[in-house]
Regions:
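Conserved structural motif at the start of ABC-family nucleotide-binding domains
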Residues: 2, 16-18
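The feature captures the beta-strand-to-loop junction immediately N-terminal to the Walker
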Residues: 34-36
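Short coil-to-beta microelement around the adenine-binding A-loop and adjacent beta1/P-loop entry
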Residues: 14-16, 67
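Conserved ABC transporter NBD signature motif
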Residues: 50, 54-69
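Short, conserved post-Walker A segment of ABC-type ATPase nucleotide-binding domains
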Residues: 31, 42-51
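ABC-family P-loop ATPase nucleotide-binding domains
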Residues: 77-133
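ABC ATPase nucleotide-binding domain "signature" region
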Residues: 32, 130-138
Length: 143
């Protein structure tokens, strides 16, 4: 379970990005984070992932997030995290080698579900296909 309690973030300029955010997400939950520009979506994600200092508490199953348990969180963004020069086949090989939690069967099933080509460079995919592939990678990373 991911718990956020009284999350606050103020930037050096004095701008308040997050104020008293509280959120509880059960394990296995898939959620979308939507809001207007400047609403704090990216700031919240960067706080959860440990990229920003913040005030408040963010825990996974009652433990502070560390490099050891962060792999239990997967996310997809509109700023694609895949390697454009690799094919999906190349991504599968990379993730299998580098991430113990990578779920190869789920990856293959989602590739089939989205009807994406395995041997074409991801950078040549349409925008919609790139978005599908981004979600597919997030769902295949063992969270």
């Amino acid at each position: 379970m991911l718990e956020i309690k009284n999350l606050n973030k103020k930037y050096g300029s004095g701008k308040v990005a997050l104020k008293s955010v509280n959120l509880t997400l059960p394990s296995g939950q898939i959620v979308g984070l939507f809001g207007e520009n400047g609403a704090g979506k990216t700031t919240m994600m960067k706080s959860i992932l440990g990229f920003l200092k913040y005030d408040g508490d963010i825990t996974i199953d009652g433990e502070k997030i560390t490099h050891k348990n962060i792999a239990r969180i997967s996310f997809a963004t509109s700023e694609h995290s895949f390697f454009p020069a690799l094919t999906p086949e190349g991504h599968k090989a990379f993730y299998k080698e580098h991430f113990d939690t990578f779920r190869e069967k789920r990856f293959s099933a989602l590739m089939e579900f989205f009807e994406l080509p395995m041997r074409r460079r991801v950078g040549s995919f349409s925008t919609g296909q790139k978005n599908q592939f981004e979600v597919l990678l997030a769902l295949s990373q063992g969270a």
